[in-house]
């Protein structure tokens, strides 16, 4: 399901999905969308959050380890992937995580604006099927007064 950041609160009231991909040019809107998802997840019992920064040297096995690690303090957790670049060949790791379908874990993927190639990639399509793609486009000059 594709939604814009300004419609996210309505979607979150309806249901909390197992995966969210939040992307966009406007860092503040991306951050606010992430905060909304985290807040709703916290209210639903997702008390733990693990943040993984995925840059060029990221070991994708870390995602598997986090998914299989048991927590001493919380039953439910959010795994947040902050993508620094394009996970072109490693999108398979995200697909494998999604296929696990653990109701006690949620995946929050945060990245910059997705180009057409990435929007058509298998891992993004899988997220679109199982969760939501939240787009936070740049604020136009006409929208700026409302934005401020």
Roles of regions detected by a PLM:
Residues 1-148:
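Conserved beta/loop motifs at nucleotide-recognition and modification sites
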